[in-house]
Amino acid sequence: MGGEDEILSTMEDFAAVYDVLVIGCGPGGFTAAMQASQAGLLTACVDQRASLGGAYLVDGAVPSKTLLYESYLYRLLQQQELIEQRGTRLFPAKFDMQAAQSALKHNIEELGNVYKRELSKNNVTVYKGTAAFKDPHHVEIAQRGMKPFIVEAKYIVVATGSAVIQCPGVAIDNDKIISSDKALSLDYIPSRFTIMGGGTIGLEIACIFNNLGSRVTIVESQSEICQNMDNELASATKTLLQCQGIAFLLDTRVQLAEADAAGQLNITLLNKVSKKTYVHHCDVLMVSIGRRPLLKGLDISSIGLDERDFVENVDVQTQSLLKYPHIKPIGDVTLGPMLALKAEEQAIRAIQSIGCTGSDGTSNCGFPPNVLYCQPQIGWVGYTEEGLAKARIPYQKGRVLFSQNVRYNTLLPREENTTVSPFIKVLIDSRDMKILGVHMINDDANELLSQASMAVSLGLTAHDVCKVPFPHPSLSESFKQAVQLAMANGTSPGVHVRE
């Protein structure tokens, strides 16, 4: 015997043969397993976490959005004078972090059980354990307290997600120096909380602890926060957060972080512009400088692969590795933004590529919608003004303040900020009037962005949007008005405001 036959001859514990094996059960892995099973394929899924749902559910989007909302309510309730102007009388608010974490843990378990029930209902076999390649079609699964066994699969979907990037000189101990994952499970509120990294994850966690009373400082090595954001939006976001009490140290690198005998963290910082170093003090430092594909433990080197193959050598039409077309990486292990919606769309594409029917194609993920869930929320989709200028695409823009919107003025009281007013900006192609980008600041940006994303991904024109009746009064009317302004190249089209 030789090759694969030789390997198989040493496999004493051979468990099962599947059409599809999915490694990882976050949003992408779950979607792939469901799609495959519903297409009539014998499917199994393996995940090493105690609860299904991946980092997205356990220590990512779900915990962060939950704590953002709860901390925002607390911040709002503290502003008694602002609320009493609307007629509501309140007792002083108090926030119990331990109770919040207990409720969050219960919520995560319940959502994990939803994943489990749906997979069971669709006859997907679930293994709780680790997975490692033995050869291109065989994977060893190790479950706690059990002898490892081998699973064979015709197709293998790799959806193992991502892990935080470590920083040289700043060792994460998850005590004083923590990851973003650990930050979302803290059961206390640090007095001085410093965050290394001004991306979306860092900013959202900054908002949580700032709302709860921590003195928050963000250290960012670049000259601006959120590098993929429209410049106007990024500048407005920074100003809004500064007005809420968050401090920013831009063009600044963390060189070293050490705790003294009293437990205080002493962080050596280097300003890239002045070239000067100085020491910053805090109680907790969170490292949030990005994430990288999580492939450790899969033993991909045993089949001649490395991390670059998952990023560079993938047929994006079928989500297939060029070397092994039956191995299909999806989600955070692939090139592009690390978003759940990207993972889900890639999962659908991967399963459809093996000849399965299902939903009619996948969405256009070239410009995925993005939301920063601070208060107010920041949302954007499509081209930025800088991107259009770089691509030499002629464009027109329309910008509308939400303060001019009837519905906006009937909603919850909000902190007044004389520097930045919530707005929506629409960018359209001057040649064919296609909607190229939409950028907004609003408490409900996550919901409003859906219609903007539809317009951008479907290639709708400004004329298409203007033909659609919008409910009144509604926040969405501001989107239509911004489109009309863009058509008129920023001059008022005399929009009639209904009473």
Curated annotation (Swiss-Prot):
InterPro entries: Class-I_Pyr_Nuc-Dis_Oxidored (IPR050151), FAD/NAD-bd_sf (IPR036188), FAD/NAD-binding_dom (IPR023753), FAD/NAD-linked_Rdtase_dimer_sf (IPR016156), Pyr_nuc-diS_OxRdtase (IPR001100), Pyr_nucl-diS_OxRdtase_dimer (IPR004099). GO terms for cellular component: cytoplasm; microtubule; mitochondrion; oxoglutarate dehydrogenase complex. The keyword Flavoprotein applies. It is found in: Cytoplasm. Keywords: Cytoplasm, FAD, Flavoprotein, NAD. The keyword NAD applies. GO terms for biological process: 2-oxoglutarate metabolic process; attachment of mitotic spindle microtubules to kinetochore; meiotic sister chromatid segregation; microtubule anchoring; microtubule nucleation; mitotic recombination; positive regulation of mitotic cell cycle; pyruvate metabolic process. GO terms for molecular function: dihydrolipoyl dehydrogenase (NADH) activity; flavin adenine dinucleotide binding; microtubule binding; oxidoreductase activity, acting on NAD(P)H. FAD binds at residues 47-56. Present with 6400 molecules/cell in log phase SD medium. Belongs to the class-I pyridine nucleotide-disulfide oxidoreductase family. This is Increased recombination centers protein 15. It comes from Saccharomyces cerevisiae (strain ATCC 204508 / S288c). The lineage of its organism: Eukaryota, Fungi, Dikarya, Ascomycota, Saccharomycotina. The gene is IRC15.
